[in-house]
Amino acid sequence: MDAAAGIAALSLAEAARAGEAAVGGKAMGLARLVALGLPVPAAVVLPVGWRGGDSDLAAAVEGIRPPFAVRSSAVGEDSSGRSAAGQFETVSGVRTTADLGPAVTRCLASAGSARAESYVGETAPMAVVIQHQVAAGRSGVAFSLDPVTGRGDEVLVEAVFGHGEGIVGGGVDPDRYRVTDAGAVRVRRAVKPIALEPSGRRRKLPAERQAARTLRDDEAVAVARLVREAEAGFGGPVDVEFCFEAARLWLLQCRPVTAMGAP
């Protein structure tokens, strides 16, 4: 409990009950994934108005293994009317509880950044998600509704080696997999000269790996099936950020599909 403000850090299950106005869009999306029984890395939410110190942060993340990803969760982001993907702050690779305070401060401050205000038109109330950062060897984004064609009979899966910010930020051309509900897969491979590390550092890939497939067919199908489960639970088209930690598939974010445009 944050003694100064009387606002407790919340588990994702508690965040679902608290509601989006208290925990923001990103946290609410994760909470809904957990409620559906889908695989999400362990996380805790600092609700809007949380004002704790280092000891409060250490207590909040007890039981969550470092490293941590500290992620802003603004009220109104990732709603069906708009997505603020990439507009607010995420601090990756936080290795100790002593480093959590500055990371949380950066996320809270991003609510008033010029970039975010120009996107959403106002300073948004901000919560923060502190999540175990898995060692992602491959990452991506998947769409239950194709953002180019508008077709809903295939799941579009985009994937790169390394950390997924390369796709979200537009810095890496991903492999693209179109997966039918019957499990058929069509692949368009891309040359991927770099992989993004959690620190943000770009690592050059060996020449023989640059054109290699990021996902096997069965892995693309596994992603597509979880996306369909999320779509059913959310009640409409979604895009989902995911990663593979070795062979284990994790979902990192889920939001409604908000716009049509080239992937």
Spans of model-derived segments:
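Short beta-strand segments
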Residues: R71, Q131, E158-V160
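Conserved catalytic alpha/beta cores of large enzymes that bind or transform nucleotide phosphates
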Residues: A159-D239, F244-A246
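Extended active-site and interfacial segments that coordinate phosphate-rich ligands
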Residues: A27, Q87-A114, S139-S199, Q253-P263
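N-terminal beta-alpha lobe that positions the nucleotide/phosphoryl donor
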Residues: M1-V129, A136-R138, Q210-G235, L251, ...
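Short, ordered coil/turn segments that flank beta-strands lining enzyme active or ligand-binding pockets
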Residues: A84, V148, E245
